[in-house]
């Protein structure tokens, strides 16, 4: 019995040693903890914020909770898979992923499901996939690869600077046809940030920003519903039951939060007063129920996650992993800007854009793609640390 038990233990040790899996110590543990905390908070707050709407629409207060739970389970599976995929695969596949993204954006215009006047979702059984969320990550992957292949051209030749802008314009045109200006703005800011970090000339950088701002203003002025949003943002109290209704209700939620909030589940504004309480305006419900302390804590966690993403990108670039570094930086900029827009819109600092709060808002496609992005960050960090470790051990042997 003793020999048998010893043999089994030895076999288990050998099997574990031979299994090719990354060491937990080589992962960015703070980033992983931040993601898990945000997902946990998101599940609780989606449950709290969605109950009145779920009861009214479906007669089941846990309708959105169940769906969010399913997407969380899928997210964990995709996260685990992503951390196991070598970054070399993403690097080789990024041109094809760009084409897949374009295909999805075309498909959604043909067979997409319309919700609140926007055709952004491809119906797949009981679920809807938001094409622009997938296209966003695929585009960032392509731009990162382009900057590696054409970095000197981007720095020295105007053609190298314009080429990625043309690709962005093709994506932006299809996304605006849905319409979805918020996603286009996120992609634009991230693209500008990457081009700047890649060493584009300063005058090109400023021209691009001014052009982008002018185009956004033009798109707002030409679309009455966007103009109405801006007017509602600038003067919400002039029309508190019309153009300014959503922002007024959101600000009322903030005002009732105080230091420690009304308590979990005790929000008044989510009771059919605040539209999109569990999606775009979930941060207002968090402010009302958890107060200043809760809001500040979540922002600290989100800020830490963004900081870790940017640090991972910086370390990758220092170690000669340019594609991995640019992609990690793109993800960090994406998370940071989307957080700023979501929080700013709910607090009346920015016009509403219909963007989710990373890892917290209800929205399956957003959650899935952001979790995949977090998995990429951990994989980049793992490969960078492994390369450094191997270089160190190789130098020590010599």
Swiss-Prot record:
Associated pathway: Cell wall biogenesis; peptidoglycan biosynthesis
Query: Any ranges marked Cytoplasmic in the topology annotation, and which?
Result: 1-25, 91, 142-156, 201, 313-324, 378-398
EC annotation?
Answer: 2.4.99.28
Transmembrane stretches, start-end: 26-46, 70-90, 92-112, 121-141, 157-177, 180-200, 202-222, 290-312, 325-345, 357-377
Classification via InterPro entries: Cell_cycle_FtsW-rel_CS, FtsW, FtsW/RodA
Membrane topology annotation: Multi-pass membrane protein
Which GO molecular function annotations are given, in alphabetical order? lipid-linked peptidoglycan transporter activity; peptidoglycan glycosyltransferase activity
Q: Enumerate the catalysed reactions.
A: [GlcNAc-(1->4)-Mur2Ac(oyl-L-Ala-gamma-D-Glu-L-Lys-D-Ala-D-Ala)](n)-di-trans,octa-cis-undecaprenyl diphosphate + beta-D-GlcNAc-(1->4)-Mur2Ac(oyl-L-Ala-gamma-D-Glu-L-Lys-D-Ala-D-Ala)-di-trans,octa-cis-undecaprenyl diphosphate = [GlcNAc-(1->4)-Mur2Ac(oyl-L-Ala-gamma-D-Glu-L-Lys-D-Ala-D-Ala)](n+1)-di-trans,octa-cis-undecaprenyl diphosphate + di-trans,octa-cis-undecaprenyl diphosphate + H(+)
Entry keyword set: Cell cycle, Cell division, Cell inner membrane, Cell membrane, Cell shape, Cell wall biogenesis/degradation, Glycosyltransferase, Membrane, Peptidoglycan synthesis, Transferase, Transmembrane, Transmembrane helix
List the NCBIfam families hit by this protein, alphabetically.
ftsW (TIGR02614), PRK10774.1 (NF008042)
Identification of the protein by name: Probable peptidoglycan glycosyltransferase FtsW
Natural source organism: Pseudoalteromonas translucida (strain TAC 125)
